[in-house]
Structures are given as C-alpha cells and as structure tokens.
Amino acid sequence: MIRRVALAVACLTAPLAAQDAVVRGRVVRSDDGTPVSAAEVRIRQTGPTTTTDTAGRFELRGAPTGPVELEARRLGFKPTIISLALAAGEARTIEVQLTATIITLDPITTTATREPRSLANVAAAVTVADTLAIQRGRTVGLDETLRMMPGVQAASRFGTEDVNIGIRGSSSRSRQAVRGVAVLLDGVPLTEPDGVGRLDLIELAAARQIEVVRGPISALYAGSASGVLNVISRSGFDSPGATLEAHAGSYGFEKYVATAGGALANGKGGGYLAGSYTQADNYRAHSEGNVARGLVRGDYRPAARTTISFDAQGSVLDTKLPGSLTQAQTDADPNAAQPAALFFDFGRADTRYRMGARLAQGLDATGEVEASGYFYYGGRTLDFPIPGQVVDLNFHRTQVGARIRAAEVGGAALDLAAGVDYDNVFGTDQRWTNSGGGDHGPRLDDGTDAAAGLGVYLQGEWEASRAVAFTLGLRYDAVTFNFTSAFPGKIPSQERILDQWSPKLTTSWRAGAQSLLYASIAHGFEVPAFGELSPGPGAPVNAQLQPKTLWNYELGARGSIGTKVLYDASVFYADVTGEFVPRTVGGLSVPENASSSRNIGLELAATVLATSWLDLSATYTYSDFRLLDFTSSVLLPDSTRQEVVYDGNLLPGVPQHRLTAEAVTRPLRALTLGLRFEWQSLVYVENGNQQEGVIYVPSTQPPGTTPVPFRSVPARALVQLNGQYQAGPVGIFATVENLFGTRYTANVVGNSDLGAYYEAGPGTWVSLGVRLSAWPKGF
C-alpha cells in the first residue's frame, strides 16, 4: 500500500495576481524537528503551490507583495498558516512546523478524473503514489510502484522494458502492451484508439505522481473499461535544481538519469528536462535490451487564469524477446528462451516521439467558467520479428481535445462540463518473411493501418448539500478502423466501425472530515486492437470479434480513524458482454469473446502511521471473474477439434486472492528502510481451470498432434528490501528483490496454442544507486 500523503497538484485554472517575491524554507515536525517530505505549501490568496522534497525543503516563486498567508499541510498533520508581509523582489526564508493531528482526506489531490480535486470528493476507487513511493525502487518500470496497490496486477515480463499491467483482470490478455486501461501522461492519452497502451515514453524518474482509478471510466476516457492510469510529470515549478543518478545491479543492469528544472523569478514561467539511458542483460536468455528516453517541459502563465504548457517526449528502445515456455521447458530451465524466439530472433526495435501543448483559460471575471484544450503530434517506427514474419510499422498520430466547464451554474451548486477528444493513428504496415534470424525475406504484405477515435462527453456534478453529491456523465465513442493493401492477392480495402454510449452515475456522502462513502453505476467499453482484428493490412478482418462492454455496480469507502489509521475499501459486481478471453495462436494474441461473464471483486487497503518512525500498510484483493456463457474448441489427439463448454470457470491468468504488506521505518533522520511482502493464490493457465493436464498441439508426425503437459501456476510469496540514505545533496539507495530466491512464474500467457503458458520471474537480484542533487541558492 502506498502511504497516502499530501500531494501538490497545481490547479491550471487558479487565478494569478501580480507576482514578484520568493518564499523558501523547510517544513519540519513540531515535536522533534524531523523534516516533513511531500507536504503541500501554498500562498492562500493566489494559489501558487509546491511540494517539499525528502529534506523538507520548498520554494515558492511568484508570491504577491504585501500581506499574504502561507499554508503548509500534510496528511496526518494539522495545517499551519503563517502571515507574511512581502516586499517587491524579496526572497524570504522561513521554517514551518507541523503538528500531528487527526487525519483528513482534503490534502490528497487527483487529476485522473479530468478535474483537479480532493480525494474526499472523488466517488471512485482511487490510489495515488507520491514522489517518495515512486523513487523507492530503480525507477525502471511502473510495476515497482503499482504492484502494491489493491486491484492492480503489475509485473515485469523480461526485466527492464515489457511491463504487464492490469486493473481488475485486464492483464489476462496483455502480451506486448497494456489493455483495458487508459494510460495518460499529464492527462493526455498515451493509449491509442485501438485500446493499446505503450509505456515507452514514460520516464519514471521524471514522474511526480501516479494516479490509478479502478473501475470503468468510459464516461470520461476512451479505452478505460477497467480503469485509468495517469502519470504526472515534474515541472520547473515543483522541481528546481539539477540531479544526476547512476544505478547498477544484477543481470547487467545499469541506468543513468539527468534532470534539470527551474522557474522564472516572476513565477510566470518554468522549465524542466530529463534524460535517461537504461541497459540490462536481464535474467532470461535472449532478453537483453536498452532504452533511451528524453523529456522536455515548459509552463508559461502570461496572464491571470491563463496557463500554457509545452512538452515533448521521445524514446528509442531495442530489446530481445525470449517468448513464453511450456511446463517441461520451465522445469528444465525457467530462464531459457523459447526455441522459436532464438530461431526467429524475436525482438522489438521501437522509436517513439510525441510533442504538443495544453492550454487552460478562464473565460469570465468570476472564475466560474473555463476552457481547456490540447494538441499533440507524434509517431513511431517499429521493427518487430515474430514467428514467420517481420513487421515494419511507420505510424503517425494526431491528438486534439477541447473542454469547457462552468461552475455554480445559475448560482446553484451545479458544475457542468462538456468536451470532445479526437485521436487518429495512421501509417504504413509492411510484412516480410522471417525465415530465421529476423532477416527480411520476400515481402508478404504492403499496406496501411488507421484507427480514428472520436469521443464526445457531458458531465454534471451537483452538491445537494455539504455532505452529499451526485455526478452524472455520458460519453459517445466511435472508433473507425481502416486497412488497405497494395500487395497482389490481398484484400485492397476494409473498414470496421465500433461505437458505444457509456453513461455513469455516482453519489457520494462525506461523513465529516474523516470518511467518504460512495456508490456508482458505470458502463465500460473496450475495442479490439489492430492485430486482434486482422493479422495484417491485407488479411481478412475478424468480423466475429466484438467490443467488450460491461455494467459495473460498486460501493466504496475511504477515510481515517483518529490520527493513525487510513483505510480504503471497494466492492463491485460487473455484468460483462463479450469478455476478451485470452488466446495465443502462433505467438499472436487472438482473443475470443465470451457471450457473457460476471466479475465480483473486493479491494481493501489500510495504512497505520504506527509511530513517527514507522508506517505499516497492507492490501487485499479478491477477484472472482467467471465465464457464464462461453464455448471454445480444443484440438484432440486425432487432429480433430471438439467444442467444449467452459461455463462457470474462472478467467485464466487472474489470481483469486492477492495480498501485499509493507513496513517503512526511519531509524535515523536521513535513513529510510522498507520491507515488502507479496502473496497471491494459484493462477489457471487455460479455460478448463485444470490444476494439471495435457493439451495437444499440431505436429508434422502421425497422428498429427503432440501432447504437451501443463500445470496451473502455484501460489507464491515474494519479499523485497529497500533502503535510502539522504545526506544533504547525496542520496544512496539499494533494493533487494525476491530476497529468498523464490522460483516462480511472473506472467501467464493464457490459452497458448503451443502450451507455452509460462514466463519466469527473476531470482534474487540486487541494485544500488546514487543521486547527486543541486538546488538553487538559498533553497
């Protein structure tokens, strides 16, 4: 469980006054003078906000002259307000003391619901990870942070690049990307119109905050039948100064990071940039890889209630892919590569970029009406050797969106918002024969792929009282797929349009300052991916594969008990039509629709602030995801196929029970130590839910099949240690994963036609790192 602390999210629409003073200093505990990290510090009159670092330091630029009030707050502490009188051009240094008190939900802010707001007012299952939680690991993959959250499955597939992330079972069919989850970077979708979310552009070391919303948010975002993952990057306002990092560890792991940020003296502008390079041999054969990433961000506030943000990201990745193994291969050597991966030289050489701007503008003098928008352009090139072919893609992407919001409409406690999103991915798709070694042989296809998504949404929020609120939202999505081919013998042109209306109704009751109860009914919508609809631009489109839709009914509660305990709970029931049941044919994802299925889940989380130096947290996830009406065929020993009914069986690839626990202690002011524990129950690998059995795969030898034994993945437990020592500008950190060297399967490839269900996790591995920081003078 991530410790919920006060997180600063600067509201883009906050009014700005004349700004020409600077306030900097430290936030400490009133009882022992210990630095308070991740505390929110702001000027109350104007809204400039920042967050303290690990040493409790902060800097606020653009403070107005004259009398002002500075407020500091953090979860578990009583807010402190200090009155100041600032002169033009003054740089004031102060110390702010916070006193432990009853916990309230107000300081926690999330933007994943399209509006910056307190967690106390979000009627959804939301978890937020702050900077300290993000930087506790190697900052290589999002799994390092997300796997401790309830309702989330997250694991590294091969070591440094491919991360399998799922919310409420969506990872069951994930192969080379995130499915069923809308992945956002600073609120703008990375997930493409076909529902595929790639994480290449996310540099975790440059992330300030990670927000996860569990459950369908299709009323706000496309491709979010299971939830939303929003990564907030750093800016020059909240991350002034420069850092250099170097990491090294087991399996040839190395990572280097450099960042720099700063803001103008008048507080109207700021910039931030980051670059990283990661390489590793990794723990499985044929899985070595490297990736370079870069990020540039600029923010400009030319006038009151006007904010313009520019950013660009790029990544260059080159990695080998070892493939999945059968049970016999796993028993012999779990770190081996699939023989076909070696022969065909499975891998991914992927270059991506994205650049654009976001604008927020107040439209009236009262601050009740505002408009915002974004425009981004990007692209990617991909060289992708797979069984029998090499896929070469050269795609472009255009994204544009606009939104208008009116608060207190008609003088009532009613907020209305309307918006539109357009997202178009298009480009060339060429296929070549792969006769071995990943070399380009004779051409197999030469065409184009395109997916254009259009979404229009409306949302109304009504505060019936100070305690009770209602939200009603409705979104229409249409995704148009186009495939063309100029290759002889292929289908010249094909089109398929998938659309859906997605409503959502929520109500929340805030029971005082310490708890929130909510109920929601929401519709979810998820479309198939390019490769799931058609194996190539000129191949027939699978007209039988339909979108997945669901109705989700949910009850939840979050809050605190006294000054020591925070809790979060949600229970849900989902009626699903067209569930994507995982199936892998020839190494490619070819899912099938289940006519109907139902999901029942329970997600619990608790954090105990036991002492000033010890935090304890735990999560529990129960997932009973069952197929109610589903029939599929299996290969028999005599090479014939037989239809089998799987009604009542569990969806493969999803553990029914998952438990995490964490203890974080600070024995010294500069030293933080952490102990993590993860446990999950057995996982079925095929639709039959057999703990062991045999499947038959095609063979060139009589009788035309070969038996391949398999077993379900047994329950497993993992333990991790981490530590960080901060001495002024020098930070030293270490991680020990899989402390006891447990042999386990990290990921399951469900219903593989070759019985290759298993991708092993690593044994014990160690990483060490050092970070050097330089802050502006006086900071």
Q: What are these regions, as identified by a protein language model?
A:
Residues S172, V181, V188-R214:
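Short acidic/polar hinge/loop motifs at secondary-structure boundaries
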Residues V126, D143-V188:
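Extracytoplasmic beta-strand/coil segments of soluble accessory domains associated
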Residues E368-F384, R510, L516-A522, P547-T631:
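Membrane-embedded beta-barrel scaffold of Gram-negative outer-membrane proteins
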Residues S465, A469-F470, A478-V479, F572-D575, ...:
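Gram-negative outer-membrane beta-barrel transporters
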Residues T93-V96, L142, N164-G166, V181-L184, ...:
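N-terminal periplasmic accessory domains that precede
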Residues W679-I695, Q724-F779:
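C-terminal beta-signal and adjacent terminal beta-strands/loops
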Residues V28-D31, A39-R42, R73-F77, A87-Q135, ...:
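Short, acidic, small-residue-rich periplasmic hinge/interaction motif at the N-terminus
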Residues S250-Q279, R284-P322, D345-E368, G410-G411, ...:
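Transmembrane beta-barrel wall of Gram-negative outer-membrane proteins
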